[in-house]
A protein has these predicted regions:
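Long, contiguous binding/interaction regions
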Residues: 1-83
Length: 83
């Protein structure tokens, strides 16, 4: 099956779902090339987390992960496809 290289950008506004996010990412670990997480304290506001996931996977796996992340409260994501 053909695979694609993608970057999944994730913003975590509500840390209550972070354990579920980590469980999802663990389920797709075979496709994940790398992961970078950055905590960020917004001026006068709460902390958010910015996470970048590089992955190579079939498009159905990419869509499935993105859809599952999108169902988590307080967490948003976007997928950018290479080429």
């Amino acid at each position: 099956m053909e695979t694609r290289i993608v970057l999944v950008g994730i913003i975590v506004n509500d840390r209550t779902e972070i354990s579920r996010l980590n469980e999802l990412l663990s389920q797709y670990q075979d496709y994940i090339i790398g992961r970078m997480g950055l905590p960020h304290h917004m001026h006068g506001e709460k902390e958010i987390s910015i996470i970048s996931i590089a992955m190579e996977a079939p498009t159905d796996k990419i869509s499935a992960l993105s859809g599952k992340i999108g169902m988590l409260k307080g967490i948003s994501s976007k997928v950018v496809y290479a080429g």
